[in-house]
């Protein structure tokens, strides 16, 4: 097995020892992605719609850096702080996965920063 770190240009420097994506044997694992700017500050505070879009754009960047598209995403793990944001998250999510939908789960939980309303981790099969 060959493992390769996937780090898009201009990516936020992680606050822990991990990379945005890791590719092995055609499978891309995208780390839990939060609505952070380049300095690890939460963006769009209080706006679940904008935070979801920011997170999915970041995931898209990782997938594209690995040579794939969002159509290659086969699984998403979604964590939201407040279940009241579920419909907003789904509305934005549907924009990024308009065709064949990936499998997923969604849970409500606390996140690493209190201003963060969403975190998504993904798996994609590329090639």
Curated annotation (Swiss-Prot):
Known EC number: 3.5.-.-
Catalytic activity: (Z)-3-aminoacrylate + H2O + H(+) = 3-oxopropanoate + NH4(+)
Entry annotated with the keyword Hydrolase: yes
Single GO MF annotation: deaminase activity
GO cellular component terms attached to this protein's record: cytosol
Alphabetic keyword roster: Hydrolase
Keyword Glycosyltransferase listed: no
A GO BP entry: uracil catabolic process
Pfam families in alphabetical order: Ribonuc_L-PSP
Alphabetized PANTHER family for the sequence: 2-IMINOBUTANOATE/2-IMINOPROPANOATE DEAMINASE RIDA, PROTEIN HMF1-RELATED
Task of the protein: Involved in pyrimidine catabolism. Catalyzes the deamination of 3-aminoacrylate to malonic semialdehyde, a reaction that can also occur spontaneously. RutC may facilitate the reaction and modulate the metabolic fitness, rather than catalyzing essential functions.
HAMAP family: RutC
Family: Belongs to the RutC family.
Protein name: 3-aminoacrylate deaminase RutC
Organism expressing this protein natively: Pseudomonas savastanoi pv. phaseolicola (strain 1448A / Race 6)
Gene label: rutC
